[in-house]
A protein has these predicted regions:
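Charged, glycine-rich intrinsically disordered N-terminal tails and low-complexity linkers that flank
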Residues: 1-70
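Generic structural marker for isolated residues within well-ordered, non-membrane alpha-helices
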Residues: 47, 76, 142
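Acidic-basic catalytic patches of nuclease active cores, encompassing PD-(D/E)XK
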Residues: 64-87
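Nucleic-acid nuclease catalytic cores
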Residues: 81-167
Length: 167
């Protein structure tokens, strides 16, 4: 991995979850990895992240990740309909960092981060529901996404299939 300093961000034409996207991620610190580096990620330690980056290992897929990938397009459509906007997936780099955005809206200079939990029955998600507090490991991810995309605002959508845009 090599680190270079650039003055501005760059939008990269990559389809998320493609082989080229996985190769791209090996060369950067990704927004979704920032919480692990900071010791905030309950799902991956700094040591595990370092090993994965060093040996260019793919993240082991799990049920929660598959669930999120399956629902994310539906969630983005829901958000776009409710807000009368058109957020699109995008990948940005800035300096040695990269961010794969669930949604980017150029006109409003904003991003969309989507989470599709299987259940709210975890301490992090129950705290979100009860206190409207974004888990710190996702907050760190969103801050890195804002940095990479040079955007001013982020929307954080927590989506489950029973949601509807109807009043």
């Amino acid at each position: 991995m090599k680190f270079t300093k650039s003055e501005s961000n760059q939008m990269i034409n990559l389809e998320q979850n493609s082989e080229a996207w996985h190769k791209h991620r090996n060369n950067y610190i990704n927004a979704s990895e920032v919480a692990a580096i900071m010791g905030l990620n309950p799902f991956e330690t700094k040591q595990a992240l370092f090993k994965r980056k060093l040996f260019k290992e793919k993240i082991e897929d799990n049920n929660a990740m598959r669930h999120g990938r399956r629902l994310e397009p539906e969630a983005r459509i829901f958000f776009n309909e409710v807000n009368n906007m058109e957020f699109v997936p995008a990948v940005f780099t800035k300096d040695f960092m990269s961010a794969s955005l669930d949604g980017w809206h150029q006109e409003s200079n904003s991003i969309l981060e989507i989470k599709c939990p299987i259940s709210y029955n975890s301490p992090s998600w129950s705290n979100f529901v009860l206190n409207n507090e974004i888990p710190m490991y996702y907050y760190a991810q969103v801050q890195a996404q804002l940095f990479c995309s040079d955007t001013e605002k982020a929307f954080f959508l927590v989506y489950q299939t029973f949601q509807s845009s109807k009043g």
